[in-house]
Amino acid sequence: MDIKVLGPGCANCKRTVQLIEDVARDRAVPVTVIKIEDMREIVGYGVMSTPAVVIGGKVVHAGGLPNRAKVEQWLTAG
């Protein structure tokens, strides 16, 4: 499963990447986290608030750190 984390490299962006990787490891779900820092590409997703998370081409989260339960839901739904 490919998961894109959109953001300029801010602290919450880095924590979002780490949270996704931690939950994936705990759940034994293979994921590839792709960090997107190019603002043109981020805006192309219609995102104005970061970090944002994109799964399957859809923005599933934007703005602030997602909680662990939400990340678990993404990984089990995929």
PLM segments and residue spans:
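Local sequence-structure signature of Cys/Sec-based thiol-disulfide redox active-site neighborhoods
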Residues: 1-19
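Conserved hydrophobic residues forming the short capping helix/wall of the S-adenosyl-L-methionine
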Residues: 20, 24, 75
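Thiol-based oxidoreductase modules, predominantly thioredoxin-like and allied folds used
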Residues: 29-39
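Structural micro-motif
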Residues: 46-53
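Non-catalytic, surface beta->alpha helical segment in thiol-disulfide oxidoreductase systems
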Residues: 55-78
